[in-house]
Amino acid sequence: MKNVKNILITGKNSYIGTSLKNWLMREPDKYKVDTVSTRDDSWKEKDFSQYDVVFHVAGIAHVSSDPKMEELYYKVNRDLTIVTAEKAKVEGVKQFIFMSSIIVYGDSSSSKRVIDRNTIPTPSNFYGNSKLQAEEGIKHLESDDFKIVVLRPPMIYGKGSKGNYPKLAKAAQKLPVFPNIDNERSMLHIDNLCEFIKLMIDNKESGLFFPQNKEYVKTSEMVKLIAEVHGKKIWMTRIFNPVLRLMFGIGIVNKVFGNLVYEQSMSDYDKVNYRIRLFEESIELTEK
């Protein structure tokens, strides 16, 4: 088939990898997509030379503070990324797309926190540090013939996603009241991410990118919206706010009610609109 892009996704059963494959396969005349598991070493025998693009999403995605996990995080998130990129380059792949994360900038904050292009990454745990070291470990491989894209998305959500979103969605359907705290988060719906990656592939991009939804999200407004989609009523109250503010040192409180946003202009992409889902629609799609 003429002009078909051959794409290999590492991370066979990952939420993002599976979502991207389904997204691209809607246009089978443009994309051929394979996936490979990296859980054992058998992937090293795979011939990468048949692929134009490797999308590397294999990794440990959710933060652990268990020191016993630290070595594994570096082995999987850093070392595996570097070895995969080296293999891709040696075997003639033209573009390597790496899923990093906003986590390289550290945790959310009890006060407003806006990341701009001049913000220096300061990871606060070994998950963030392993991602940042992976970025740094593949930089030197870039050349005219081997383009590298690094994506640092914020929290990704969508139907079937993992992490904090489904926990909040469950709370929205069960709790009669929820704290109304003024916070702002950058988020990214899975369809917007997949469309963005498609543009990276189509335009043979290289560089560092910060895709996010058009709108910032206030946690209480998101929970209210989720409840409404399910026909539930939830009362937003500020009565718990003083107690919650004292608890911002606790990880889960900070993750749910903290502030962490990208400055909006960082996420624009050459006037091309990859944000095909606005926030309200994205919640309806996720919850239906």
Predicted segments with their positions:
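Catalytic helix-loop patch of NAD(P)-dependent Rossmann-fold dehydrogenases
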Residues: K75, S110-L151, M155-I156, V177
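N-terminal Rossmann NAD(P)H-binding glycine-rich loop of SDR-like oxidoreductase domains
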Residues: N6-R26
